[in-house]
Regions:
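Conserved anion-binding
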Residues: 12-15, 19-23, 97-171
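Glycine/small-residue-rich loop that forms an oxyanion/phosphate-binding "nest" at active or ligand-binding sites
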Residues: 53, 58-118
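Catalytic cores of alpha/beta
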Residues: 73, 77-96, 180-215
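Glycine-rich phosphate-binding active-site loops on the catalytic face of alpha/beta enzymes
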Residues: 94-112, 197-201, 213-229
Length: 237
């Protein structure tokens, strides 16, 4: 299983949110590049980055900082937030980004996902964010009546390789991941499933690993010290 240390960005700074609420944003480190280098030193090969300003503004905002990580470290970068058009995907694909995560557009504009997968293949992943099993969009500010499994199956049928599943009620809470939903999703589709939200300690990592998940995104647990990144990477080798 892959471990994805996370950097969420507002105003060019690394932050974390509680349950996706922008009013709870807390800066968690001094700067992005130094933080990314610390992940490399811990043995990470990937990093999960989110342009939170982009999520709200529905356009790329912090893309320069994200591209800098791809070009100034050895990390493979996956990026989500504010990606609404093919030109956004083009930009990241041509600037060293290894995976582009389509979120809100998966529900609102599935034709874009289809076109993107056709052109970029496994570079494209889909982020499914859910509250009580139903998909939320636009930086989690809008709900829907679409069940997360239904959206996942639709994405699978379009050829999407990787799905990042976030349980919003767990995100930034350090209360453990929603293992039940993750296992249900992993069994329902053939896509690689990455867990996001609630990962707290090494036991969570081992549980996700033993349930056959592809990856785990770790944010607040690293910054608050409840998870040792070096150990997390070691138990997943």
């Amino acid at each position: 299983m892959l471990i994805f240390p996370a950097i969420d960005i507002i105003d060019g700074k690394p932050v974390r949110l509680y349950k996706g609420d922008f009013a709870t944003a807390q800066q968690v480190a001094d700067d992005i590049i130094t933080t990314a280098h610390s992940f490399v030193d811990a043995g990470a090969t990937w990093i999960h980055m989110v342009d939170l300003d982009g999520s709200l503004k529905k356009e790329r905002v912090n893309h320069r900082a994200i591209v800098d990580v791809a070009n100034q470290t050895s990390l493979k970068v996956e990026i989500g937030g504010g990606i609404r058009k093919m030109e956004d995907i083009d930009f990241y694909a041509n600037n060293g980004i290894s995976r582009v995560i389509l979120g809100s557009v998966a529900l609102k504009n599935p034709a874009l996902v289809k076109e993107a997968v056709k052109e970029f293949g496994s570079l494209i992943a889909v982020g499914i964010d859910a509250k009580n099993g139903f998909v939320a969009t636009e930086g989690w500010t809008e709900g829907s009546d679409t069940h997360f499994i239904d959206l996942a199956k639709q994405m699978e049928s379009m050829g999407v390789d990787t799905i990042i599943y976030t349980d919003i009620s767990k995100d930034g809470t350090l209360s453990g991941p929603n293992v039940e939903h993750l296992v249900e999703l992993n069994n329902a589709v053939s896509c690689n499933i990455t867990a996001s939200g609630g990962v707290t300690n090494i036991n969570d990592i081992i549980t996700l690993r033993d349930n056959g998940l592809y990856g785990a995104i770790c944010g607040k647990s690293i910054y608050q010290g409840t998870l040792d990144l070096v150990k997390a990477i070691e138990v997943c080798r």
